[in-house]
């Protein structure tokens, strides 16, 4: 935490930068996903035909909006009350897990699209829809880059919340048994 709280200059720009960077990343991933459409003699494949891809698109849109709001919240000087710290902590955790969950689901579906699974008669589709798969894969990679911004933000907000509490007292085993 020295990197975050050591220098005043570092403290002033690291968190807002980590909060603003996902805006561009999430919007880029969202735009790529929305443009993912390809047709051939087998039919037309769009992102909206696959629930996991819609989930990632929605997650990127929601996280971009949250990043804008949280960036504004981090640059406007306010007192760091316990309730505000908890609010930021809960939302940082929620959006980090939203991105993680969406990325994990799309990773699995994309793996099946590339490799298939003959045991359950799920055949690979990426040889037939290569451009579509490449765009979805690029959107997924960009989403994971946004996740790499959300993870340290979750750690920073967790540190802010839990540093406001006293550590638990350490008791010896004899003290515990004598109190019972």
Swiss-Prot record:
Q: According to its record, how does it sit in the membrane?
A: Multi-pass membrane protein
Provide the transmembrane region boundaries.
Answer: 14-34, 56-76, 86-106, 136-156
Provide this UniProt record's keywords sorted from A to Z: Cell membrane, Membrane, Transmembrane, Transmembrane helix
InterPro entries annotated for this entry?
A: CASP/CASPL, CASP_dom
Write out the topological domains of type Extracellular.
35-55, 107-135
GO (cellular component) term, any one: plasma membrane
Superkingdom, taxonomy of origin? Eukaryota
Q: Where does the protein end up?
A: Cell membrane
Cytoplasmic side stretches: 1-13, 77-85, 157-180
Q: Which family does it belong to?
A: Belongs to the Casparian strip membrane proteins (CASP) family.
Q: Which NCBIfam families match?
A: A_tha_TIGR01569 (TIGR01569)
**Can you state the subunit structure given in the record?**
Homodimer and heterodimers.
Instruction: Please identify the protein, giving its name as recorded.
Output: CASP-like protein 2A3
Species annotation: Picea sitchensis
């Amino acid at each position: 935490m020295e990197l975050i709280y050591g220098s005043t200059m570092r403290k002033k720009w690291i968190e807002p930068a980590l909060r603003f960077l996902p805006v561009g990343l999430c919007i880029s991933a969202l735009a790529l996903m929305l443009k993912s459409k390809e047709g051939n003699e087998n039919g037309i494949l769009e992102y909206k035909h696959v629930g996991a891809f819609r989930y990632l698109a929605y997650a990127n849109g929601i996280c971009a909006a949250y990043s804008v709001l949280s960036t504004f919240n981090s640059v406007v000087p306010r007192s760091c009350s316990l309730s505000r710290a908890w609010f930021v902590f809960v939302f940082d955790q929620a959006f980090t897990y939203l991105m993680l969950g969406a990325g994990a689901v799309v990773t699995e579906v994309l793996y099946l699209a590339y490799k298939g699974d003959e045991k359950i008669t799920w055949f690979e589709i990426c040889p037939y829809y290569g451009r579509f798969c490449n765009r979805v894969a690029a959107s997924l990679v960009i989403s994971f880059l946004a996740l790499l911004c959300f993870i340290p933000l979750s750690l920073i907000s967790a540190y802010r919340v839990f540093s406001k509490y006293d550590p638990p007292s350490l008791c010896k085993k004899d003290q515990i048994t004598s109190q019972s």
